[in-house]
């Protein structure tokens, strides 16, 4: 067996409508599938950005993350951009604040962080 690529990343959110608006309307993800699962009383939303898929589970009863951002599990989700200054301006025009742009000492590339509505760290990496 040979692993070919990461197929998707899954994120549990506390407010489905708020997170759907954030990822689709503000960040520009494309909706692939959307389904309410009555037996679980939750929403499942499959999104696409380029070749990457993001799976959103809207679970109002999910426990909160125990510590931030150093809890076990997903630390952050990073997006590659060509021009970080342009990307920061684009996010600002949608009401999304970012941290100060800084240099990644390991890669020598510029990066910054922002957060989704549940506080999940999201990274821009040039």
Where would I find each of the regions flagged by the language model?
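Core segments of cupin and vicinal oxygen chelate
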Residues: 12-54
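N-terminal beta-strand motif that seeds the catalytic metal site of vicinal oxygen chelate
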Residues: 1-18, 74-79
């Amino acid at each position: 067996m040979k692993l070919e690529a990461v197929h998707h990343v899954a994120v549990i959110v506390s407010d489905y409508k708020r997170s759907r608006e954030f990822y689709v309307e503000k960040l520009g993800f494309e909706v692939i599938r959307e389904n309410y699962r009555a037996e679980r009383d939750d929403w499942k939303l499959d999104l696409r950005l380029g070749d990457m898929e993001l799976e959103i589970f809207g679970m109002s009863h999910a426990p909160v993350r125990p510590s931030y951002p150093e809890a076990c599990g997903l630390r952050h989700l990073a997006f590659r951009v060509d021009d970080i200054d342009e990307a920061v301006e684009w996010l600002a025009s949608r009401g999304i604040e970012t941290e100060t742009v800084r240099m990644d000492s390991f890669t020598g590339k510029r990066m910054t962080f922002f957060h989704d509505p549940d506080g999940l760290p999201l990274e821009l990496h040039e």
